[in-house]
Swiss-Prot record:
Annotated Gene3D superfamilies: 3.30.1320.10
Signal sequence extent: none
Main subcellular localisation: plastid
Family: Belongs to the bacterial ribosomal protein bS16 family.
Name of the protein this chain belongs to: Small ribosomal subunit protein bS16c
Cellular component terms (Gene Ontology): chloroplast; small ribosomal subunit
Xref: PANTHER family: 30S RIBOSOMAL PROTEIN S16, SMALL RIBOSOMAL SUBUNIT PROTEIN BS16M
Keywords noted in UniProt: Chloroplast, Plastid, Ribonucleoprotein, Ribosomal protein
One annotated GO biological process: translation
Length: 85
């Protein structure tokens, strides 16, 4: 099963996260299938690869709670609903 989850990058005390598609059994820092976004909580920046995220969601990937909140805050699901209508 696939998950969309955060992978920690950056320096000490300056965490930056990549949003990645990864197998559930892998470690947090394990090898990811694909990088689908970027999140910087310090600068409050988010960058999303929408086609890649849609692809993995259609394949059955489940976002973690934090990734779901990031996607909702970026109004990702409003875009998805408008493309489905």
């Amino acid at each position: 099963m696939l998950k969309l989850r955060l992978k920690r990058c950056g320096r000490k005390q300056q965490a930056v996260y990549r949003i990645v598609a990864i197998d559930v059994r892998s470690r947090r820092e394990g090898r990811d299938l694909r990088k689908v976004g970027f999140y910087d909580p310090i600068k409050n920046q988010t960058c999303l690869n929408v086609p890649a995220i849609l692809y993995f969601l259609e394949k059955g990937a489940q976002p973690t709670r934090t990734v779901y909140d990031i996607l909702r805050k970026a109004e990702f699901f409003k875009e998805k609903e408008s493309t489905l209508s």
